Amino acid sequence: MRAKLSNLQSIPQVVAEMTLDEKLDMVGCYRACHTRPIPDMDVPAIYLMDGATGLNGTHVVLDYLTDPCRADDPRTAYATPEMVALNRVDLNEAAAKYKGDALMTDLVEQAAKYRPGGRQHISFPSGINIGASFDPITAETIGRAVGQELRDVGVDVCFGPNVDIARDPLGGRNYEMYGEDPELVAQTAAAFVRGMQSAGIAACAKHFLANNQETNRNTTSSNLSKRVMMELYARGFEAAIEDGHVLCIMSAYNAVNGEFTSYSKKLLTDLLRGELHFDGAIVSDWGAAGQNKEGTLAAGMDLIQPGPNDMTACKQAVQEGRLSEEVLNDRVTHILQLIVEIKQNQRRIPAQYDADALLQTACRTIEDGAVLLKNENAVLPLAETRRVVFWGARSRDTLECGSGSTAVETALHSNVLDEYRKLRGVAAFEEWTDADTLVYTAAAPAGENVDRESMAVEEQDRTRMTEVLKQAKQKGMKTVVLLNISGPVEMADWLPYADAALCIFIPGCMGGVAAAHLLTGLAEPGGRLPVTFPIRYEDTPAYPNFPGEGNDAYYGEGVFVGYRSYEKRKLAVQYPFGCGLSYTDFSVELCENDFRWDMRTQETLNVPVRVKNVGSRPGSEVVQLYAREEKPRMLRPDRTLVGYAKVRLAPGEETVVNVSVSKKALRCYDARMDKWVQPIGAHTLYLALSAENILAQAPLMIEGKNPYPLNGESTIGEILENPRAKEIVNQFTNGMFDMIPKETLDFMVYRKLNDILSVGMIQVIPDTVKLSAILQGLYDRLAEL
């Protein structure tokens, strides 16, 4: 009798008694979406599927088709639309329709396993909707809801969330991401992971690393500096690991600086496991590691997806000593640890499933992330006396999800026209009746495998929307544009003719319901833009470099992604990062006007802000804090988001909210030292309602250990800034600084101290040994400061 998998302590013995073939089958994935079970060792299979917006029906079909016992059936080569449709059609009707067709009958039974009682899957809001909420509580709540949905149908690992950075507006999968700012992405990612894993399934943060475009995604190298990598593109993963305790991370298709992520020891082992301290399971994106299985395992990959994989070459590599069995054992150990943690969590956390509650959570999330961009003369919410006509095909057919991994096959849908009629009784569609208000719904789709061609809305609406809005204004009507979009769109042509603009992004199956609630005032728009909306694409930071040249994508904008770049270049935008209106009004002010932060004793800085709802409706405000280092050692943005808090208040209600700022929000990565540094000294703190709407500012003095100890490599300017350092240098040099004219010192501020002293003192002390000893004594004294 062999060892049994019962807990983490049992894993070493289980691994020791597994056969080589069992180990290889474990890391090679048994079928498309689940690992190999070993019944006599009590090792269960775990099911890994997309995604963060709900169950991906294609995965359900592929997992059945890739069973090794069906390898000879030609119809199992790929999932047909007819097969995938079984995730949403009536299963009783499907069973009758395919009676006598063994494969399709089996697929009906497979679909039924994922649809208990024939129920429909829920399509949840996209990542951009969640990021737009600017609220970790919302992110955690929707994460838990998605986890409950997936657990109910037997999924153990969800391929999500997508914690990449929205680098360029045309990125095909930007709508899956939480935004353009690393602090926003970090807080949202960690909260979503906590929520999902609280439902008893594992989250899988993706795609590691610098996966920001779909063009040539399998061959492109993202070329960026270590600083940019750490400050921006690794930040969401770091937060998911440290604050979310994510159990699984997925590698990306792309290369980074010439090394494909799935084969890179530098990224998977040195960075992810070493610097970011990840101890969970690393899985490949589908097909990203299939060409060199031996190489990907050696680099640090634990699970090669999708299965089944032919592991013959890996077996030979182990037998010939080219791949250490110890390495293979480590990979198997990580998978078994994942299995144990999932099963322990599922025993500890009762399964919960309430479809109505999940749909309500989805709807509230859309409302919390809906961004009111424009609202002249308080057109919204629409008064009950308004006679409304809807225009645009998307008024009847909501763009609910993107294509590819986030696509959810379901018969649950909603649209704003039908839902508005349920609430208000009557609304026309595309006819010039006696209506006094026009609502035009426009969309901008996106999805996996292809980047957006432009920032335009769908072709059917590009000229039509402007013409219809113009005509409505000529008739004296009020006009509202409902934006059902994957990211920023061009607005110059039509925005002047819109009294109001409301953005619901890619909302999932409850999009129509939420939109109707927002239009009628049953809900308040609580979102803020998680990405900048530029006036034109040519103004965007990555425009000269996106999507790259051949198979190279050069991240030439560096740390100046999104609002950081527009602020640095003083470029006007259509709508700035963090902006969004409410149906009510707020007063927001700092409670203090001067801040000191001793980082040696305080992990966080709490900034008290007084917020009052001075309007007539309940609503929410997002208090944002930005910071600036006054004398940075390296090129830094003028302002960066360092903290935010969402406040919900009734009319007349007032509160003081403490906005928390972490050390990580203010640090920077010094590539020369190859480590994080925590700047000290003078900073400015900005209270804002967007990256542009600054309400107040206050000085912030940060105290702590100097990340740049004073020594011979320090500049003359740095020495002069520190009175004690200046005094010490004068002691060792007989008053050098007092003897040099000020205009000469001003010219020398960027010269290194060692260069100046070595040249000047050698003339006085020609004995180099003695001189070196004196200088070392000086530098030792400086280092004590």
Model-derived regions, located:
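Glycoside hydrolase catalytic-domain context in secreted enzymes
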Residues: 1-667, 682-686, 691
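Low-complexity, acidic Ser/Thr/Pro-rich "mucin-like" tracts of secreted and single-pass surface proteins
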Residues: 75-79, 731, 785
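Phosphate/pyrophosphate-recognition segments in soluble nucleotide-handling domains
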Residues: 347-360, 434, 695-722
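In a subset of proteins, long, contiguous C-terminal domains/tails are tracked
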Residues: 562, 578-583, 616-618, 649-653, ...
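Terminal connector regions
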Residues: 663-706
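Compact, charge-rich alpha-helical regulatory domains located at protein termini
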Residues: 706-774, 779-782
